[in-house]
Amino acid sequence: MIKVIFFDLDDTLVDTTKLAELARRNAIENMIRHGLPVDFETAYSELMELIKEYGSNFPHHFDYLLRRLDLPYNPKWVSAGVIAYHNTKFAYLREVPGARKVLIRLRELGYRLGIITDGNPVKQWEKILRLEIDDFFEHVIISDFEGVKKPHPKIFKKALKAFNVDAQEALMVGDRLYSDIYGAKNVGMKTVWFKYGKYSKEELEYREYADYEIEKLQDLLKVIENENGSNKEVHPAR
């Protein structure tokens, strides 16, 4: 029987993909507005290359962007990018549709909830606290704090140990087939692939590790009912 439900954070509970793209575009526009002597498409393309190389949690994207563009360091331009990026994040941060209702219902049904996410602990906690969903979760496991990223089994085992449950008693919900689904399945958890955001059509070679697939987070409730024997309408992933 499932007792604990783990969620990924980005594009599982928090609508991250759309937010990040908007924030980056606004950052470049604000840098140009304050004197960056480069056209938007060139600057944005270089920024995306930087993110691809260094990851989205790298703290010096805008500093390195100036180097990539063969421009001298200018704190005004960097500050303009940082301010616009964070202002956009704060203004447009949203939950994935239906997330809060699902969390409320799962708590009402007596399930214990946790988060297993990759990323910078301060940035991830900022999202959780700004959306005021922290009270739903007993434990939040974040890769950069633990020293190991998904899909490494250690981070999933750490989460199971925190809840003192066996893998068969836990279910992982995430948007990434490789890091979330493959990783959780390898330690024995049940898995639900949430087909949302930029990874909904990627990493399909790991699709076989998903026990279920859902396109709306609300459908997780049917999955849970099916797993615990009270609903036979949900069908496992193909």
Curated annotation (Swiss-Prot):
InterPro entries: HAD-like_hydrolase, HAD-like_sf, HAD-SF_hydro_IA, HAD-SF_hydro_IA_CTE7, HAD-SF_hydro_IIIA, HAD_sf. Catalyzes the dephosphorylation of D,L-glyceraldehyde 3-phosphate in vitro. GO terms for molecular function: metal ion binding; phosphatase activity. GO terms for biological process: small molecule biosynthetic process. Belongs to the HAD-like hydrolase superfamily. Keywords: Hydrolase, Magnesium, Metal-binding. It comes from the Archaea. It is an enzyme of class 3 (hydrolase). It holds the Pfam family Hydrolase. The keyword Hydrolase applies. This is Glyceraldehyde 3-phosphate phosphatase. Its cofactor is Mg(2+).
